[in-house]
Amino acid sequence: MSRFIDRVVLHVSAGKGGNGCASVHREKFKPLGGPDGANGGRGGDVILVVDENIHTLLDFHFHPNAKATNGKQGAGSNREGANGEDLILKVPDGTVVLDTDGNVLADLVGVGSRYDAAQGGRGGLGNAALASKARKAPGFALLGEDGVERDLVLELKSVADVGLLGFPSAGKSSLVSVLSAAKPKIADYPFTTLVPNLGVVSSGDTTFTVADVPGLIPGASEGRGLGLDFLRHIERCAVLAHVIDCATLDPGRDPISDIDALEAELAAYTPALSGDSGLGDLDKRPRVVILNKTDVPEAAELAEMVTPEIEARGWPVFTISAVSREGLRPLTFALAKMVRDYREAHPKPEPKRQVIRPVKVKDSSFTIEKDPDIPGGFVVRGTRPERWIRQTAFDNDEAVGYLADRLARLGVEDALVKKGAQPGASVTIGDVSFEWEPMTPAGIDLTRTGRGTDPRLDQVERIGADERKHARRVRRGLLDEDA
């Protein structure tokens, strides 16, 4: 029998976008063929999909890392790189996706429901797409962007119409076994059931599922025992059925006190899906009380005595024996009617594909703050500047010049001047720090040089901080000029 795993931490990594290509078309009798480097392919996404044949999160327990494939690099002759293949991860029906802070990102209910857990990075532009009047044959291309990488928490909440609640050894597993064809483990000791058991029950034209939730004890809502793990599985149940052991010999226990204790735990528990399950709060769910083990004479007398008091709360009461199968028929009909009424009031939604929307590409806002670690330095933050930094190959002067032009058009250079930045000041954007120098914008009269170079970068011959310090010490006579 396979292990039942209902909570895992999954690390997902989308594919990286492929780099663009910088190439020039070469053909006989065409000395000026022009740029023909194509764009890189997009990285693959990581997608969670509900599959009817998957019933546990066991695979993710043993394989907690999932990575999609990268996009391919572009090539010459305008051959675009292939996109990375999406990674499809199959999850069971009822999987809830949360971030590491416990916020619900997606509630996957219904076969075919999808959630884009991580989006692949965009491919870099090739030099054919970067050609302009100022750069007719760019000697550079843009790098592909990294894909989204994040940690997700997957929790499985059983998708059942009726949840059977009760203390350990109340006979819940026995009831599931006689109502359906399920064969749960049954034994005469507490906590025999450690995972929810699902059974399919047919009553006339109605078919519904019953979940045997492992036994609850006082303090379960605060995590005592395995309470939180057990209570999680009742969040989707439309009907809550209290299974009461009328034959218990435990001191201080009776049907009324057991019901009160179970209701106290339900009232204290805060479901993660309270607003998203569509079923309302737990205290508003329909209730039914099942007085079990009435094949024992003393239990039958006790059940008859407490029935009026329970019915006074407005809950239907059924007296049964899972062993002798007495009273099962009216119970099955009643549960079927309650489920049928719920389904009519709550039509089943169509499976939805839930997607994480990336930040808008047209977001041109940015901020500039003084660098607390470097005197006279500045830190630039913004969606576009940080993306452009990641796309730039800094071993290519022409690519660096293109980056400078983009930042200038965005207004970063003017904003640095207004902030008091001096030539040679340290500027940090993303993970890159550099000495800032005002540059002349590239125009159509830009001096032609070799591909991959930018003459504007050669015009700066500013001495560094160490050289300035050395010059001051020479002027003061502290060092020889040749030292």
Swiss-Prot record:
Residues of the OCT domain: 358-438
Gene Ontology biological process: ribosome biogenesis
Positions bound to Mg(2+): 173, 193
Gene Ontology molecular-function annotations: GTP binding; GTPase activity; magnesium ion binding
GO cellular component, one term: cytoplasm
Ribonucleoprotein as UniProt keyword: no
Compartments where found: Cytoplasm
Record carries keyword Ligase: no
Family classification: Belongs to the TRAFAC class OBG-HflX-like GTPase superfamily. OBG GTPase family.
Free-text function comment from the UniProt entry: An essential GTPase which binds GTP, GDP and possibly (p)ppGpp with moderate affinity, with high nucleotide exchange rates and a fairly low GTP hydrolysis rate. Plays a role in control of the cell cycle, stress response, ribosome biogenesis and in those bacteria that undergo differentiation, in morphogenesis control.
UniProt-recorded name of the protein: GTPase Obg
